[in-house]
Amino acid sequence: MTTPISPTQPASIAYDDAPLTRFHIRIAVAGTGGQFSDGFILGIIGIVIAAAGDTLGLTPLWTGALGAATLTGLFAGAIAVGPVADRIGRRWIFGWDMLFFAVLSLLQFFVQTPGQLLTLRLLLGLVLGADYVVSKSLVTEHSPRKFRGRLMSLLAVAWAAGYVFAYLIGFLLTGHGDNAWRYMLAISALPALLVFGFRLGVPESPLWLARHRRDAEAADVVRRHLGPGVLPPTAPPLSQHRGFTALFGPAYRRRTGVGALFYVCQVIPFFALGTFSSQVMEALGVTSKMGAGALYNVFLLIGAVVGLLLIDRISRRRFLVGTFFIGAALLTVLILFADAGASAIVVIGLFAAFAFLMSAAVNLEFVYPPELFPTDLRASGVGIATAASRLGSAASTFLLPVVEAGHGIDTALVGCVVILLVGGLVCWVWAPETSTESLLDTDLAPTSG
């Protein structure tokens, strides 16, 4: 790991080309708390639904609604907080949102009705939507260009770790009394509380400060944390057209569309199959649902780590397009083999391979959207992409059990294949390459379309 520049060395290194320091890693690790918590509460809900069904009197409608509740809250939180974070900054939202998350997580322990749990899941989603926006923006803006992909991918690994940890907690607590599901829900407060104190000392983004003409503050952050050898960022004045007006205007509408569509097409099959993996395995004829789920989650975590290792070795476009088309092919083969009566080992293996691939691709959800937009639109742009994806995910987790019950698992899986193909085609035609772009250049030069 590179250390900061010597105090005797004159400032000569561009902010975006600064060497990697402990400060950068600390910022990235601080950003992982919300992602771990998000992965956990989204991963645990399927297990909780199965365990609390009788106690809460869950109908198929309540099951679908609870599966989609957090995602729906994420939609609202991301789209509402994005413009706010672009106007007031990232630091304070980033510092305090995990405390609210911890309180809401603990309240889940005391729910008595499906409606109470639904309300808390929606509120948790709102907080996580805010955290998605500010975490991705803040970590991106603090990261040197050369290491940005890997630092942002730490957030993806944290998300996968939270998702897998949820499965482990569910496995350990299932069968330990009628209230075991309450502990499954409340335990998500622990990582949020751990990261809360760690975040309070994180400084504001120098890029955001410079963009808002607070140059002295930006220079002070750079000097204190990166040393005098790194030049503070400079930025043009704020555009007259900001927020959603600019995002859907001629300069950025293509990037806004690509950011939203790739995200939607990636997470719909990921969340639909992940949330109800046990039910999917049962419908495909696999009797060892717990073993299948364990393998699925192991490959989920491995995929996220492999994605981190690959993210700066493969162009963003190649990673995007390739994982969409390969994912569609894997899922098609899975359907055909399952229909042909393939053994459980083959079906589970294909499902695990799909989980591995999609989890590796999830790294792009953390790296790519923040790179598409300039600093004064970054949180809003990430908010639009996140909101669109969570709306699609909420719909898919609500509809998958309904479609599977009415038309069979093949119909649900074929729908996922179609969505993956659409995502691949959209990225093939319109996705720009961002891995070599400086964030300073993105601020200075509006893109076309």
Predicted region positions:
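Transmembrane-helix signature of 12-pass secondary carriers
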Residues: 1-449
